[in-house]
Amino acid sequence: MLVKLLTKVFGSRNDRTLRRMRKAVELINQMEPDMEKLSDDELKAKTNEFRARLEKGEVLENLLPEAFAVVRESSKRVFGMRHFDVQLLGGMVLNDRCIAEMRTGEGKTLTATLPAYLNALSGRGVHVVTVNDYLAQRDAENNRPLFEFLGLSIGINLPGMPAPAKREAYAADITYGTNNEYGFDYLRDNMAFSPEERVQRKLHYALVDEVDSILIDEARTPLIISGPAEDSSEMYIRVNKLIPQLIRQEKEDSDSFQGEGHFSVDEKARQVHLTERGLILIEEMLMEAGIMDEGESLYSPTNIMLMHHVTAALRAHVLFTRDVDYIVKDGEVIIVDEHTGRTMQGRRWSDGLHQAVEAKEGVEIQNENQTLASITFQNYFRLYEKLAGMTGTADTEAFEFSSIYKLDTIVVPTNRPMIRKDMPDLVYMTELEKIGAIIEDIRERTVNGQPVLVGTISIEKSEVVSRELTKAGIEHKVLNAKFHAMEADIVAQAGQSSAVTIATNMAGRGTDIVLGGSWQAEIEQLEDPTEEQIAEIKAAWKIRHDAVLAAGGLHIIGTERHESRRIDNQLRGRSGRQGDAGSSRFYLSMEDALMRIFASDRVSSMMRKLGMKEGEAIEHPWVTKAIANAQRKVESRNFDIRKQLLEYDDVANDQRRAIYSQRNELLDVSDVSETITSIREDVFKTTIDGYIQPESLEEEWDIEGLTERLKNDFDLDMPIAEWLDKEPQLHEETLRERILEKAKEEYQRKEEVVGVEMMRNFEKGVMLQTLDSLWKEHLAAMDYLRQGIHLRGYAQKDPKQEYKRESFNMFATMLESLKHEVISVLSKVQVRMPEEVEALELQRREEAERLAKQQQLSHYEENALVTEDPNAPATAERKVGRNDPCPCGSGKKYKQCHGRLQS
């Protein structure tokens, strides 16, 4: 009560922020007449003037009013479009490291030009982040004339571009690209073998479009660069045949319930659990199939990988549905993004899940992958010095933006008042009744000339509605993952009179639905349109636009509630843009996933008490409240999952930053000999300590073991026993010094043979490759630790603290292994001529390039990260055998060619 009273008196934080910014808007408006008087050349010269002022020490905030005024005036001259005052407010919010909530149709793309220009003046680069390649290209090309008029360069960063083109794109003042591509480039840069291979500059300012989609919906999805692991496709096929024989039961076994089935499903957590009967049956079937030995248990340590196959196959059959979670196209399983309904070509689920789905669908099974590098969007975007974002729906997630990204959310007012009519939900008993009511609503509205957009949550649901509309003889267009290429065109024309468009979730997001259809699209179809033709098209569009407005504007139909209120608001937000008329309604049934899992009991009993008849709907504030509560529950659970993922990834993130920092230092120096000398001393001290304890008696020394270890690990023949016999005065300290001295002499001998420069290059290459190899193994071990760490909770230990402790120990062990491995490789390599070192260096580079070509970019499926079944780490790539053909192509056996360069 007191908080409400204080807010009434002083205004909310949002109001106070906007009030402060409106003073700057007034200042920009006062500058407008002066800007109009400037010639084009004088206006263009402002960019260099601003840059000079920044170099002299002026801060960006002081330049903001004048810089925004320059962009506004330039936009008027280049595009014929003047930034509204609310767009200036949006630009200031984005410059202020905040999230700007701007409704659909309020001109977010034009708003973004203001902070992009201002922050590009420093010359440190601005990254504009979009959700797909189409929007990145569209926005870059649309804004290119404005930025080039102002003397700024524009780059577009797309998947598949060669490194030189990417480097050029990143060197531009403003770069447009997708969140995935920026993240993958960061990972690839940290796998480069020379400074020239890197493409990104230091991460300065990121301006994220559809920020809720990228920083929240995809936050649970780490970006992973992976290479091929061991082939186990046959096992997936064999296990897949057994799963259909298992029977589902309604809930897990407990003291009060014993079912008859073999597994239960937790739909909230998206997990499958084998019952005791299920475990016995699957073990019997595995033994009958000859996959598992008689008397063995599926839970024995030797069968961890087999358990992994069974779990993956069970999840593939029970939790993942064709045309909902994935589609099968040209013999390939392609993931469908649960948030956008778009296909994710080239992305694969991890932990063997993708292979299990391929086995289920009977398509060719591709190899499992091993993680080489990974990062979450949460941690990637927190690397930027300055981060901001914009979207039409952020306020419901303001707490998450603040707690995870330290970004405040500011709701920017609309240019014109919102007059869309949002009608209460209608709830039916069955899916069939609901679909029937939707078809009837569409029929009534299209007869009056009103366009309708139908939002569904999956491809399967969109095709169900499409079939019913076809039966009813209603013309319509379907926009889902299967028709991705036509997306923008279909959306652009969805505002035509009586048009019916079915869209999965937010497919087509980023393209405005204009009432009466898009007149720009009509003009683009003409080769060289004349002024008269353009005027005719605009006049015809005006008539259509007014007719659609009179019919009530765009009507939105939601076929069910999404688990997030924000996604529902996004669907509604497609209507009522820029003060246009519009309406929306959601149709629900008790068979919808959200209602069945979260709101079924209360609403079902209410409907029964009311004596609902077939075809009747309930429309009541209580129902709306129950649904809103269900959505809040899901949002809260999803937030907890994202927060938990971040807490675990923060541990890996600290290690990642340390490794990447070390790696970049290595790349940037040409001589690592001092580091090698320091490491050699550490490694030999540790090795000798294992056999000769400091300050111990000679009788306690294991001379034979030390001699053998020096030979095996470093290829050093040292007659230590002979030295001790011949030189009684040789004590522990002098013995240590002699061993190290002899090791240095042997190394210097090799260096004299091949030359200093060649040896320096070889040292650097060995350090980089060893670091990458051990980091890859460390990531696999971390994944393995992460998947089983929750079991520590049963021992009254905090899993997060245990994970931190163990991962730190693993990291320390990895660093020690790195030192030992580097010195071992450098000591054991046998060289006779400089050409041999050059050949070895070439072989190392070819292997690195081959691996780079085989890299696959993957997304973890969210629940694969929190699966309860620990999986064995993936095996490293197969090494070249001594009797295999040499990879250099000479035709000789490896041991007789490049293999002889290594002991």
Curated annotation (Swiss-Prot):
Q: Which domain of life is it from?
A: Bacteria
Compartment(s)? Cell inner membrane; Cytoplasm
Needed cofactors, names only, are: Zn(2+)
What are its E.C. numbers? 7.4.2.8
What does the entry say induces or represses the expression of this protein?
Repressed under conditions of excess protein secretion capacity and derepressed when protein secretion becomes limiting. This is regulated by SecM.
| A GO term for molecular function | ATP binding
Q: Where does Zn(2+) bind?
A: C886, C888, C897, H898
Record keywords, A-Z: ATP-binding, Cell inner membrane, Cell membrane, Cytoplasm, Membrane, Metal-binding, Nucleotide-binding, Protein transport, Translocase, Translocation, Transport, Zinc
Q: How is the cofactor bound?
A: May bind 1 zinc ion per subunit.
What family, per the record? Belongs to the SecA family.
Note the HAMAP family from the entry.
Answer: SecA
Q: What is this protein called?
A: Protein translocase subunit SecA
Q: Native species of this protein?
A: Serratia proteamaculans (strain 568)
